[in-house]
């Protein structure tokens, strides 16, 4: 189950989508996105054929952070067995205008061990600070940075063309770049939430786990303007780790 957190290390993009919608709480402009506050995706987590837990992704709120309007998103993973339990939360704050990461928080409970990491990210200076370190200091980042959770929301805003491979340098920790995305095919699939037309991508990043260069993982997105995450399947040396969408709740205020 140690590979579960790697589910979020999926994807990035080269450019920020700009939109004309005015922010409800101020005068800043928001990028056009296919999600809104209250959107929620619920998943069944399986290891092979065995159900081991649940996960969900949610757009929690539209908040003000350091004078910027930001989408607050969260990803929860809960499950395991009597030998190993996981209760992880990943929270991202994404600039609503530029779709760059402003803050990223990980709270991990895995196998009885608790880990917390908190990052303040400054796109305007291309630096980040891990604030929960004993001696926090500025570290080099990249322009228009994205974190683990914001990758999954950002990829939903851009078109994907079958047969193309995209290399991106937008992960906020430069040593993890580039992220490579292969757009493999389109197909129709059935998940607990229903039957969908899907576009399939394969992410590869410089890390260990399910998205490593030596591994193989695929993500199915709905083949429409929303790019809802429908399922994820991975093949590991000791089995397969999979997520399947079981319920989708659109934003009441898209």
Language-model region placement:
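Intrinsic-disorder/low-complexity peptide segments enriched for small residues
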Residues: 5-9, 48, 144, 150
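Sec-dependent N-terminal signal peptides of Gram-negative exported proteins
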Residues: 1-17
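Acidic, serine/threonine-rich low-complexity disordered tracts
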Residues: 19-123, 157-254
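Hydrophobic, well-structured mid-protein blocks that either form specific transmembrane helices
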Residues: 113-157
């Amino acid at each position: 189950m140690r590979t579960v957190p790697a589910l979020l290390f999926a994807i990035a993009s080269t450019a920020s989508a700009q939109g004309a919608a005015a922010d409800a709480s101020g005068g800043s402009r928001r990028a056009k996105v296919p999600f809104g506050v209250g959107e929620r995706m619920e998943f069944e987590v399986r290891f092979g054929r065995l159900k081991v837990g649940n996960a969900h992704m949610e757009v929690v709120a539209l908040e003000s952070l350091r004078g910027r309007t930001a989408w607050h998103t969260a990803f929860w993973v809960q499950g395991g067995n009597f030998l190993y339990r996981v209760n992880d939360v990943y929270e991202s704050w994404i600039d609503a205008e530029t779709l760059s990461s402003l803050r990223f928080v990980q709270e991990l409970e895995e196998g009885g061990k608790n880990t917390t990491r908190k990052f303040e990210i400054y796109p305007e200076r291309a630096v980040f600070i891990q604030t929960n370190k004993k001696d926090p200091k500025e570290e080099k980042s990249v322009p228009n940075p994205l974190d683990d959770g914001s990758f999954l929301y950002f990829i939903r805003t851009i078109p994907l063309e079958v047969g193309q491979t995209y290399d991106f340098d937008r992960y906020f920790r430069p040593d993890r770049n580039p992220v490579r995305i292969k757009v493999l095919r389109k197909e129709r699939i059935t998940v607990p939430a229903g039957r969908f037309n899907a576009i399939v991508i394969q992410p590869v990043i410089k890390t260990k786990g399910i998205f490593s260069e030596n591994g193989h993982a695929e993500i199915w997105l709905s083949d429409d303007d929303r790019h809802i995450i429908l399922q994820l399947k991975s093949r590991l040396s000791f089995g397969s780790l999979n997520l399947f969408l079981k319920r989708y709740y659109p934003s009441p205020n898209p």
